[in-house]
From Swiss-Prot:
This is Uncharacterized protein L41. It comes from the Viruses. Residues 60-192 are annotated as: Disordered. It comes from Acanthamoeba polyphaga mimivirus. Belongs to the mimivirus L41 family. Residues 60-102, 117-129, 147-159, 169-192 have a biased composition (Basic and acidic residues).
């Protein structure tokens, strides 16, 4: 009994499959007819507008169903609407190979029949994967929900053409031209010309220098060879020690040069030297005598005679003069005595200025035994010892003609007994080692223990010339 029921089910299933097959064939024929009508309508529209139809708008060829193939469709297809989405239509169209005919093209792009083939008009995706053309129809399972196929977009011809358009221009524009523009002009403009210019400049300098040295060397050698045996022969102009010289005497090796400021200097070898004549003559008229590189002139004559009248004597290369005579005489009459380049005079002031000021020096320092080392007439007297203001025996180191007295001990204001500063106005100041202790003012000199009149009388007795230089009333407190 069970076997009869199974046979009945098999027969009923075959009948259902046949019905489904007929329905699917009718549906596919209707879809193909609609697609062909749409393609023809698009072609007519494009021809009216004189527009060349792109490959995407070509008429899709009708597919032919091979005999022997089984199209298995699920029962749920009967429930779908008659108009199906484009994605499903494409999936069904590409399930089987497509035949192309001459009638499928417009008159402008109609090819010859001999050139029509399935392989020539295949898409790029089909060339890459040949399995898509002969892929068998898969069986649809009713229990699985399938998503609409959208991957066919990648096999569209528009993608392949866009890739070609996007990549090729980029390669041509960005790589090849940029390398040519960036590299070759830089090497030509900046590297090669700079190197050529710098090297040529250096070569020219070296060539000129070598030529000049050769010329000077040959001139000097020829002149010396020619003049060695002629003592009276003097070369008026030549080159020596890389400088231009004049009146060259090859026997004595004497010559002179002219500096950029016009000063003339005479040499003997490498030392400034000239016999009995100034070895240096400046533009302002100053004349200087040298002997083997140092100031020297015989017969007690000045070694420097300035253009303004100053005269300076040198002895053994240092400012000095034989005897008790001034080594420097200024044009205004000032006289200065030197010994071994320092202010010094054994008897008398070492400096006497135009106004009569006298200064005593010993070995470059202000010094005078028991007498003022600086005497400024009608002004002041100053006692110094080894360059320091100092006076012994409780006597003032500074005596001003106006009446002021100041006591110093080794250059510091100091007095053991009594005020260290006494002024004519009556102001008395006490100091110890340059520090002020107190100060007071007195009006009656006779009644004060420090009688100013007695001090002045003692000064007059010791320095009688104070009365002759200035007259003033010692009792006057003004």
């Amino acid at each position: 009994m069970d076997s009869i029921i199974n046979i009945f089910k098999i027969l009923s299933g075959q009948s259902n499959n046949s019905n489904n097959l007929e329905n699917s064939e009718k549906t596919s024929q209707d879809i193909a007819q609609k697609i062909s009508d749409n393609v023809k309508q698009d072609n007519t529209d494009c021809q009216d507008e004189n527009y060349v139809v792109p490959q995407l708008k070509r008429k899709s060829p009708e597919r032919t169903i091979r005999s022997g193939e089984e199209n298995t469709v699920h029962d749920s297809l009967n429930d779908r609407p008659a108009k199906k989405p484009k994605n499903d239509e494409k999936c069904q169209l590409f399930d089987k190979p497509i035949k192309v005919s001459v009638d499928d093209f417009t008159p402008t792009e109609k090819p010859s029949e001999s050139n029509i083939s399935d392989e020539k008009y295949k898409s790029l995706s089909r060339e890459k994967s040949s399995s898509m053309v002969s892929f068998p129809v898969r069986k649809i399972n009713s229990q699985i929900k399938y998503r609409p196929v959208e991957r066919q977009k990648s096999s569209d011809r528009s993608r392949s053409s866009s890739r070609k358009r996007s990549r090729l221009p980029l390669r041509e524009r960005s790589r090849s031209p940029s390398r040519e523009r960036s590299r070759s002009p830089l090497r030509e403009r900046y590297r090669s010309p700079l190197r050529e210019r710098s090297r040529l400049h250096l070569r020219e300098k070296l060539i000129l220098r070598n030529d000049s040295l050769k010329k000077h060397k040959t001139d000097f050698v020829v002149s010396t060879k020619y003049d060695v045996h002629d003592k009276n022969k003097i070369i008026p102009e030549t080159i020596r020690y890389n400088k231009k010289i004049y009146d060259y005497n090859p026997i004595d090796d004497t010559y002179y040069e002219v500096k950029y400021n016009g000063t003339k200097i005479w040499y003997k070898g490498n030392l400034v030297h000239r016999d009995e004549l100034p070895a240096m003559i400046c533009v302002d008229g100053t004349k200087k005598w040298y002997q083997y590189g140092q100031y020297e002139r015989g017969n007690d004559l000045p070694s420097i005679e300035s253009g303004n009248g100053r005269k300076i004597w040198y002895l053994d290369g240092k400012i000095g003069r034989i005897g008790d005579k001034p080594a420097v005489i200024e044009p205004d009459g000032e006289q200065r005595w030197y010994k071994d380049g320092k202010y010094h005079r054994d008897k008398g002031p070492a400096v006497i200025t135009q106004d009569g000021t006298m200064m005593w020096y010993r070995n470059g320092k202000l010094h005078r035994d028991e007498m003022p080392a600086i005497v400024q007439p009608n002004i002041v007297y100053k006692w110094y010892e080894n360059g320091l203001k100092h006076r012994d025996n409780d006597l003032p180191a500074i005596i001003n003609i106006n009446g002021d007295l100041v006591w110093y001990r080794y250059d510091k204001i100091h007095r053991d007994n009594g005020p260290a500063i006494i002024r004519k106005t009556g102001v008395l100041s006490w100091y110890k080692h340059d520090e002020k202790i107190r100060e007071e003012k007195v009006s009656l000199w006779e009644k004060n223990e420090y009688r100013y009149i007695d001090i002045i009388k003692n000064l007059y007795r010791e320095f009688p010339y104070l009365i002759q230089w200035h007259y003033w009333n010692p009792t006057n407190s003004d």
